[in-house]
Amino acid sequence: MKVLAPLVLASAASAHTIFSSLEVNGVNQGLGEGVRVPTYNGPIEDVTSASIACNGSPNTVASTSKVITVQAGTNVTAIWRYMLSTTGDSPADVMDSSHKGPTIAYLKKVDNAATASGVGNGWFKIQQDGMDSSGVWGTERVINGKGRHSIKIPECIAPGQYLLRAEMIALHAASNYPGAQFYMECAQLNVVGGTGAKTPSTVSFPGAYSGSDPGVKISIYWPPVTSYTVPGPSVFTC
């Protein structure tokens, strides 16, 4: 495994991904419609950068005026594709299979989802899928599941506008920091029907992750990984 790792890294060096569209009630809202997509599919590697919130420099991110209405308590699906021009949904159309790591989703309540930068405090985690007991990673489930990343919008949050930050972290080069590859985009939501019964604790981006976190700096090749701690806070529950 130690011998093969450099070959894996070299072959996967340019294999990236983008959260390109959002599906609500079985309807895809359209490429870049209500999702801030970059023109390039490369990762963010600096967890202290403002770009760790909703992507950004060195990537150019397009704005969108659409705010997608979502019913609290329902599931939405982030659709991941290798490039904006990718039309298929085979594993290779999503992300290289070497890109093993967690899938994560956060929400942040904002006054205006179309203009809020996402940088700073207010984020709370609503989904995570790390490595299961059989050694299969969250990214593998998305890659082999046609790029579909299912996320439940909690029923107990207050109604209003939110940013939805969907993320996949690739750990194939994470034995040193920087090395982990963070892929994230933000969707713009108007959440309706929430009860507001609970107020989540929040974290900041940048700030929620550290380069020394065990879920950020880790060798997934050798020694064999037997457990994995997803970075960031615990998942908010109602």
From Swiss-Prot:
Site feature Promotes oxygen activation, where: 172
Glycosylation sites: 75
Biochemical pathway: Glycan metabolism; cellulose degradation
GO BP annotations listed: cellulose catabolic process; polysaccharide catabolic process
Binding site for Cu(2+): 16, 99, 183
GO MF terms, alphabetically ordered: copper ion binding; monooxygenase activity; oxidoreductase activity, acting on paired donors, with incorporation or reduction of molecular oxygen; oxygen binding
EC supergroup of this enzyme: oxidoreductase
Annotated EC: 1.14.99.56
PTM comment text: N-linked glycans containing mannose and N-acetylglucosamine.
Bilayer-spanning residue ranges: none
Applied biotechnology: May be utilized as part of enzyme mixtures used in the degradation of lignocellulosic biomass for biofuel production or other industrial purposes as it improves efficiency of conventional cellulose-hydrolyzing enzymes.
Keyword Oxidoreductase belongs to the record: yes
Pfam families assigned to the protein according to its UniProt record, in alphabetical order: AA9
Main location: secreted
Active site feature: 172 (proton donor)
Needed co-factor(s): Cu(2+)
Residues that, per the record, bind O2: 45, 172, 181
Function as written in the Swiss-Prot or TrEMBL entry: Catalyzes the oxidative cleavage of glycosidic bonds in cellulosic substrates via a copper-dependent mechanism. In the presence of an exogenous reductant ascorbic acid, degrades phosphoric acid swollen cellulose (PASC) to cello-oligosaccharides and 4-ketoaldoses, the end products oxidized at the non-reducing end. Somewhat active toward tamarind xyloglucan and konjac glucomannan, with improved activity with glucomannan in the presence of PASC. H(2)O(2) is able to substitute for O(2) in reactions with PASC, xyloglucan and glucomannan. Very weak activity on cellopentaose.
Subunit composition and interactions: Monomer.
Family named by the database record: Belongs to the polysaccharide monooxygenase AA9 family.
UniProt name for this protein: Lytic polysaccharide monooxygenase NCU01050
Taxonomic lineage from the root: Eukaryota, Fungi, Dikarya, Ascomycota, Pezizomycotina
